[in-house]
Amino acid sequence: MTEPAQAIPGFQAAPLFFLIAVFLMLQPLSTDLYLASLPSLATVFAVPASTVQLTLSLFVAGFGGAQLVIGPLSDRYGRRPVVIAGLSLYLLASLLCGASQSIGMLIFARFLQALGCCSAVIIARAIVRDAYAPQDSVRVISKASSWVSAAPLLGPILGSFLQVHLGWRAAFVVHALLATALLIMVIARLPETNLYKDPKATELSGLARNYRIVLGSPLFWAYALPGALSYGSIFVFISGASFVLIKVLALPTGWFGYCFAFGVSGYLSGTVVCRRLHARFGTKLTLRIGSSLSLAAGAIFLAMVLAGMQHWAMIPPVMFMTMGAHGINFPISQSNSVSPFPQQAGTAAGLMGALYMLVAFIVGTIVGGTHNGTVYPLAIIACSMGSLIFIAARVLPAMIPAEHTV
């Protein structure tokens, strides 16, 4: 029987695994908990869908940009002060979100919330590297990922309940309560896990050198870009599904969470399939299979819309397929875009995350800007993203020399 992963001596008394899991859950909860409220926000503030979408798009932009600086800051100053500062900012931003009297204030508060949320996610990954032996770190991340999967499954359901019974501000009150509980636990129980602080971690010359190494490598782009486009394909639905389902296709708000959770379950299924496909077919072919599913999902969605289908029941299966494809594409992208850089692993991971968020920001902005009260824009964008993933997954890895094939 496999022994459970244990923290290295000196950290075993701390609830590290629990904190790691909850830190990682903060990102999906920060988004999924208020998705059902997006159409209501457009009504309350009397603004178009494109303006409301900025509460999502600028969140991912802030999250993506923060990834490039939070890691080096924690390397220099330690994990505790960075995550305490980040959670404090997240708490204040959540309260500001809930108290917002204008859409502009809400957008600004969501941007601040993203900065605080990013600190928790980055520090969780750093703690795994600090406090667990290499042979245990994979098991820790795998187990934590199982916990994290509950957030996008249950978050939209809870968010729909809160919207129906308490209104849109309730989601941000829950965010604030979660941040308060985490802050108390961090201050009371989280030790400093960075025992080898690097005073040069934030020097611009070193950062620039590492960025050049990673961004100049075709190995990085061969897998990071298809993965980022795949994330963009699911962000099509994260940013646009609530408007289309609730406002266009007349889905009751209370049902939205269950429809979205069904779609998210596709991602969990995809990750299971990915492990089996990779063991049998290897990296490149597995990515091609996942990208083919991405294209199929988008093409089926567009075909149904062009055929005149106008019922909310057509969207959850397409979401399931799209997120299932991402469940195949994402693990391949994540591992193969970072593993070629053992000396710049943190930089590669940060750049990969920033690229994901950049694509999500662009997609979210397009989804919001093209919303016209019909299903057509969402279907066209979904099919376009599937096509881009399909092309990128074939063209870019094929350009890697044979000796570098993973």
Predicted regions and their residues:
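Paired small-residue
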Residues: 89-96, 104-112, 313-319
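A late C-terminal transmembrane helix in Major Facilitator Superfamily
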Residues: 334-372, 382
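Cytoplasmic helix-loop-helix junction between adjacent transmembrane helices
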Residues: 109-150
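Conserved MFS/SLC helix-loop-helix module at the cytosolic interface between two early adjacent transmembrane helices
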Residues: 65-104
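Helix-breaking motifs and short loop linkers at transmembrane-helix boundaries and internal kinks
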Residues: 44-46, 78, 99-105, 116, ...
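Structural signature of the two symmetry-related core transmembrane helices
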Residues: 81-95, 286-301
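Juxtamembrane intracellular "pre-TM" segments in multi-pass secondary transporters
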Residues: 2-10, 193-223
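Helix-loop-helix hairpin linking two adjacent transmembrane segments in secondary transporters
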Residues: 105, 135, 142-188
